[in-house]
Amino acid sequence: MVADVLLTHFNQLFCLNDPGHPLTGQEMKKATIVEDGYIAIKDGLIVALGSGEPDAELVGPQTIMRSYKGKIATPGIIDCHTHLVYGGSREHEFAKKLAGVSYLDILAQGGGILSTVRATRSASFDNLYQKSKRLLDYMLLHGVTTVEAKSGYGLDWETEKRQLDVVAALEKDHPIDLVSTFMAAHAIPEEYKGNPKAYLDVIIKDMLPVVKEENLAEFCDIFCEKNVFTADESRYLLSKAKEMGFKLRIHADEIASIGGVDVAAELSAVSAEHLMMITNDDIAKLIGAGVIGNLLPATTFSLMEDTYAPARKMIDAGMAITLSTDSNPGSCPTANMQFVMQLGCFMLRLTPIEVLNAVTINAAYSVNRQERVGSLTVGKEADIAIFDAPNIDYPFYFFATNLIHQVYKKGQLTVDRGRIL
């Protein structure tokens, strides 16, 4: 077979054999590091991988050849938890955070999510599209090729649908692949304050059926937290969403442990998000139910909290984990997955291999894209992040710098030395 593109002489390729399930426990610690590696691409797919000189049959007169001495290649990074589409920003809350005002106190004062809801409701489709596109561009420049994007800053049908429509438009227009999550249950809207059940009924009866019919989202999510939605309320919504055919995610155990993990395990959610306050018993429940733990260390960093999710304990117990940005305008205003990956080492005490497995193959399982992306594997799409680094450890050791040299998306050179092509 003659390749369309042949990438050669990488110092290292980060490869693994996808075992057919998210990596857990000792599997998280393993990878195949190919020295002097090459990747052959045809029709957007990886058709060969190896070490040394590629087979002569891969090279034809039209084959594009590129050498990457001094560079490493990983699968394209996957950010599987973002609140991508929103209006406004919340830097005016930063001084309050520095003064020690808590996230929930800011929310109670009408700030936080509700502040962004007001800004998003007043934002046009074009405003939201352009703002979200800029964030996606930034992510792409940092090696991200697939992104999960939630609604949740509308809390009414008109605005929630506008957010989902923006995600759908960007999925068509932008190189990054987007996976849509419907999260109208991100907070209790002011017009339903004191009556969250009535709001959930509106979501179930009026919103979810349309989202499903128009294929606007693949997943449904809810914020199960003190002063937001209870475990029973979360169970009520997610069970109805599951009946309609949605895959499930749940924000749980971020600030307090109030039963969100039980809901995730009972309903076989694909992932439970945050988990800073998770208990040993709850870790066992998620393992038993096969729920992926999606950890968001940049949120803990941004909130200036001391308690990070117990990633080391989770992995050692046999749990599958991922890492994501939680990109949003309030509790985590960043879109930099390289920073999150570095926090995975510095604050969660994971190894570079564990982090790379978390943000590639496990993240692919978290967004139901494991058949297409998540590993440098023959037959999968050629989503490749190329780092200006001599080895796999270097992008973690040399932190706070964008080390992306190039990005390939479906076999196309998409980012070249800081420019989107």
Swiss-Prot record:
Where is it predominantly found?
Answer: cytoplasm
Give any single GO term for biological process.
L-histidine catabolic process to glutamate and formamide
Location in the cell: Cytoplasm
SUPFAM superfamilies in UniProt = Composite domain of metallo-dependent hydrolases (SSF51338), Metallo-dependent hydrolases (SSF51556)
Q: Which UniProt keywords apply?
A: Cytoplasm, Histidine metabolism, Hydrolase, Iron, Metal-binding, Zinc
Which NCBIfam families does its entry note? Answer: hutI
| Name of the featured protein | Imidazolonepropionase
Organism annotation: Streptococcus pyogenes serotype M12 (strain MGAS2096)
